[in-house]
Amino acid sequence: MSCRAGFVWESPQHFNRYIEDCGVSCELVTPHMLAAPFFRSMLNCLIIPTGFGNPAYCRLLPALRASSKRIEKFVENGGNLLVFGAAINRADAYDWLPFPVTYHHDCHPRRIDCSLSPVTGSLVEDYDPENIECDGIFPMHEGDAAGNSSEGAILIEKTIGKGKIIVTSIHEFPSRTFLKTFCSSGELTPF
């Protein structure tokens, strides 16, 4: 089964190539494309990388807010969404998601327990769970905590309609197994 991921950022990154190396076709979706009503693509998964909320790294947050209903509809119709850490202490960094999430930016390695969800747990299977770089925690959210540190949630899962949203503050590339499984489990959905 072939699958297509949309990688949302201003320019190509190493992450794009990593996604392709995992056997997933990857399309760069710039902030202008994301917010443009005429942009259409068929995707299984949309990936929002670390730093999306920090204006020192990109100008993505306004486009995510402008596209929030479109993103929600994409997930409701069967697409999957993978969101990483905002990389800034902003109470409203995740206000574009269809459920409340509060993020506390704090970079350092953490011990993570991902035993509650086999799919989400595979995100870190290439790393030592005793020492994984994270850029924060999610002290409050309306999802299921699928990965926790002693300080709070690191991985959140939420099913919306036929799709799934995973929010994580893990500051590493997801495992190849996770990326292939998560992207291909989403339905090919118009975005």
Positions of predicted regions on the chain:
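A structural signal for short, well-ordered beta-strand segments and their strand-loop junctions
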Residues: E27-T30, E76, L82-G85, V167-T168
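Alpha-helical scaffolding within the catalytic cores
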Residues: P31-A35, A66, S150-I154
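Short, flexible loop segments at the rims of nucleotide/cofactor-binding pockets, characterized by
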Residues: G23-E27, Y57-L61, G143-G147
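A glycine-centered loop/beta-turn motif at secondary-structure junctions
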Residues: S2-C3, D21-C22, N80, P139-F191
